[in-house]
Amino acid sequence: MGEDPRTPHRVFLRSAYSRSGSFGTHPFPVRHALHNLQSEAESRPDPFIRRTTPQALDSSRQEVASLLHVPKNEVVLVKNATTGVHTILHNLGLKKGDAVVYFDTVYGAVERMLFSSVEMTSMALKKVKYRLPLHPEELVTKFVDAVRAARDEGLNVRAAVFETIVSMPGVRFPFERLVEVCRAEGVLSLIDGAHGIGHIPLDLGTLQPDFFTSNCHKWLYTPRGCAVLYVPLRHQHLIRTTLPTSWGYIPAPDSPSTGASTMQTAGGGKSAFESLFEFVATTDDTPYLCIPAAMKFRRETCGGDERIFTYLEELANEAADIVAGELGTEVMQEPGIKHWKESLLRKCGMTTVRLPIPIQDGTDISPDAGKKRVCMPLPADEVPGVCRWMQDTLVDEYDTFLPVFPHGGWLWARLSAQVYLEKKDFEWVAPILKDLCERVGKKSQPEAKL
C-alpha cells in the first residue's frame, strides 16, 4: 500500500490526498470506466437507460451483495446514505405516539431529517446523550435506558438510528451490540453505515440488522453519488416508495389504480422491491455502474478487501499516535486502554486526536485542567470561526484538509487513512497542525472565510 498502488503510474490524483474522508475519491481506472459509461449514455440515451442500465445495475448489486454477505435481491442502490436513511424513515409510516431513538453524535443531516419528520408526522425523538471517550458498553446501557424511558412515557419506540463509524468524532460505534439489543427490545435497527462498506468488514447476513445503508463513494472507490441500501426480505413489504416517488411506486391495495409504467425495462423476473429502485427519476446513474470497476481495482491493484481493511486500520492508528505525539495530546479511545488494538473505538480507518485548544461549551472542563493546552478556553461563539480558519488554512497554505470540530470541551481533528497514504504523509501534517494550534493560541488567525 502507500506508494505501491501509485507505481508505475499514480492511480489517484495527488490533490485528493488526505481529503477523502468526507466525500471520497476514486482511482483513474474507475474514472475511465465512468467516462466511458457517460459517453455511451450520451450517444444512445434511450437504449442505455432503458436496456443497458438495468442489466448493469444487476452486476453492481451482485458485487455489493457479495461483499456484504447477503442475497442480491436484498440490496438496491441509492444516491447516498442520507437518502437511504430518509427512504426507510419515510416508508415506516411514523405517526404521533411513535418514537425514534438516536445518538448525540448523529450525522448532522440525519438529525435535521429527523427534525423534519417530527414536523410532518408529530412523532417523537429521543436522543441518547453522551460524551466521548467512554466504554462502548456504556453506550449500549444508555441506549437501553433511553428506549425504556420512552416507553415509560407511553411512546411506541419504532426504530433506532445509529452508525457503523461516527463521522465526527471519527470512532467505530458498537453497532453489532446495538443490533442485538434492538432485536431483544423489539426496536427496528436502522444503521447509517455511511463510513462502512469498503472500510471495515461487514457481514450483514450474520448480523441481520433491519435496515442498513452505506456510501460506496467514500471507501469503496466509486464515483459520487453511490450508496447501497439493504432491506431484508422480511421487511420489503414496508418499502413502497423511493425519494422522490417514481415509476416503481407500489400503491396500497385501496389506492386508485395507476397507468402502466412507460419505463418497463429489459430486466425481468425481479421483485417489486428491486424494480422500485431501478429507475428513480432522470439522473446520472453511471456511478452505480462503476462498482465492478471499483471492485476490480480493489482486488487487482490493492490486493483485496482484507488487505485494505488491515492497512486502513493500522495506518489510521499509527497516524493518530504520530499526531498526538507531536501535539503532546492523546487519541480518542476508551479510558484505560494501553494499546490501540485493545480499543473498539479505534478499530477502523479513521481516528480522532485532541488539539491543545480547550473551549467553553457549557460543560465542566475542570477535570481536564491538567491536559496540555496552548490557550485559555475559547468562548463558544468563537469556536466555529476558529474551526473554519484552521480548515481554510490547511487548504490554502498546505493543499490538504482535516476536519476540525469541538467535542467535550476541546477541539479535535479527524484523521482518515487511505490506500494512497502512508506514514510519512501524517509525519508531514503533524507539525502543521501543531503550528496552527500555536497560531490560534497567539490569536494570530485572520477572519475565517465563510
Roles of regions detected by a PLM:
Residues M1-L450:
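Pyridoxal 5′-phosphate
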